[in-house]
């Protein structure tokens, strides 16, 4: 990196600046993946994908002009792997958001996995597109979450009750 003296005259100064921010904030974003969920998690995956794709492109461009090709090759491989992972997670996030938009206006900001009940929308934890709903006299629970007056269940942006995906046991034990 150069100093600020030749910043305006350097033709690739903007690329160097973006790369510096990319290298600095990528570990912070990766840690934020552990502590975030929902819409923030999806947006973080999109940011990390853009970050990794820029870093990969810059490293492959510089690779052919550098003398230390091993380090750049390893960095490009790591950026490529993180980019592929973030792309798949971003794709899941975008498709679930689009499915929720297709359900109607009131579902646009809803969680991807939720239960619609008499009291409103309740977020549930679901592994994949599976949930287990149990109705007993006096209560209904979905994946261990008590739900007053179950109306419908949405998993991954799709209504699950109408599709027969949910195990609904009436008066189970």
Curated annotation (Swiss-Prot):
Its main location: virion. InterPro entries: Arteri_GP5. It is found in: Virion membrane; Host membrane. Keywords: Disulfide bond, Host membrane, Membrane, Transmembrane, Transmembrane helix, Viral envelope protein, Virion. It holds the Pfam family Arteri_Gl. Residues 1-11, 61-69 are virion surface. GO terms for cellular component: host cell membrane; membrane; viral envelope; virion membrane. Signal peptide: none annotated. The chain crosses the membrane at residues 12-32, 40-60, 70-90. Residues 33-39, 91-173 are intravirion. Major envelope protein. Heterodimer with the membrane protein; disulfide-linked. This heterodimerization is required for transport to the Golgi complex. Belongs to the arteriviridae membrane protein family. This is Membrane protein.
């Amino acid at each position: 990196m150069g100093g600020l003296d030749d910043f305006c005259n350097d033709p690739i100064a903007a690329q160097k600046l973006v790369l510096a921010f990319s290298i600095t904030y990528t570990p912070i974003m990766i840690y934020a993946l552990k502590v975030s969920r929902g819409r923030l998690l999806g947006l973080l995956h999109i940011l990390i994908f853009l970050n990794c794709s820029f870093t990969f492109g810059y490293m492959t461009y510089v690779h052919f002009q550098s003398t230390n090709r091993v380090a750049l090759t390893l960095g490009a491989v790591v950026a490529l792997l993180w980019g592929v992972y973030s792309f798949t997670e971003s794709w899941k996030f975008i498709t679930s958001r689009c499915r929720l938009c297709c359900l109607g206006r009131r579902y646009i900001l809803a969680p991807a996995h939720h239960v619609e009940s008499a009291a409103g929308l309740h977020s549930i934890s679901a592994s994949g597109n599976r949930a287990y709903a149990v109705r007993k006299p006096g209560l209904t629970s979905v994946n261990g979450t008590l739900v007053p007056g179950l109306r419908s269940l949405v998993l991954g942006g799709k209504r699950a009750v109408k599709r027969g995906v949910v195990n609904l046991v009436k008066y189970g034990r």
